[in-house]
């Protein structure tokens, strides 16, 4: 299982939110480039980057910082937030992003995901953010009537192969991830699923790794690695051990 250290960008700085609320943002580093290099030094193979301003405003808002991170690190970067059209997808991939995450646009313009998957294959990821089982949109400010499973299955039919699944109620809480729902989504769809939200201890990482056989291929770590609750290097080691025999 792969560990993804997260860097959420707001106003060019590295922040963490609580349950997706921008007003609760806490700044952890004024220099996201140095933060990305720090996670790379810890052994990360891929960094999870989110343009929070872009997610709320519907267009890229932290391009200079994103470009600087891409130029500084040698590891892969997956990026989400404000990716609503093919031109933005193409721009990010040309900049050096390894994977782009499409969230709100999958609900509002599902044909975009179809075209993107056909054009870019597995470099396209669905960002599936759920609140009480329903898909949230617009930087989590809105909630649709579509369930996470319904959207995942529809997007699979459009060529999707990978999902980042976030239980919003867990995000930034250090309350433990919703691995039951994450594993069920993976089993029900056959998609590769990256778990996100609520990771608090190394035991949470172990529990996720134990479900690798169910389709959980990665875990995104945010607040826990900024508070020191989880050490990135240890999480990577534990994740590599995979599920127990």
UniProtKB/Swiss-Prot annotation:
GO molecular function (one): 1-(5-phosphoribosyl)-5-[(5-phosphoribosylamino)methylideneamino]imidazole-4-carboxamide isomerase activity
Statement: the UniProt record of this protein carries the keyword Isomerase: yes
Entry-linked InterPro entries: Aldolase_TIM, His_biosynth, HisA_bact_arch, Isoase_HisA-like, Isoase_HisA-like_bact, RibuloseP-bd_barrel
Pfam family, one: His_biosynth
Active site per UniProt: 8 (proton acceptor), 129 (proton donor)
Catalytically driven reaction(s): 1-(5-phospho-beta-D-ribosyl)-5-[(5-phospho-beta-D-ribosylamino)methylideneamino]imidazole-4-carboxamide = 5-[(5-phospho-1-deoxy-D-ribulos-1-ylimino)methylamino]-1-(5-phospho-beta-D-ribosyl)imidazole-4-carboxamide
Pathway assignment: Amino-acid biosynthesis; L-histidine biosynthesis; L-histidine from 5-phospho-alpha-D-ribose 1-diphosphate: step 4/9
Keywords recorded for this protein, A-Z: Amino-acid biosynthesis, Cytoplasm, Histidine biosynthesis, Isomerase
Region forming the signal peptide: none
Gene Ontology terms describing biological process: L-histidine biosynthetic process; L-tryptophan biosynthetic process
Cellular-component GO terms for this entry: cytoplasm
Compartments reported by the entry: Cytoplasm
EC code(s) of this entry: 5.3.1.16
Family classification: Belongs to the HisA/HisF family.
Protein name from the UniProt record: 1-(5-phosphoribosyl)-5-[(5-phosphoribosylamino)methylideneamino] imidazole-4-carboxamide isomerase
Organism, as annotated: Heliobacterium modesticaldum (strain ATCC 51547 / Ice1)
Protein encoded by which gene: hisA
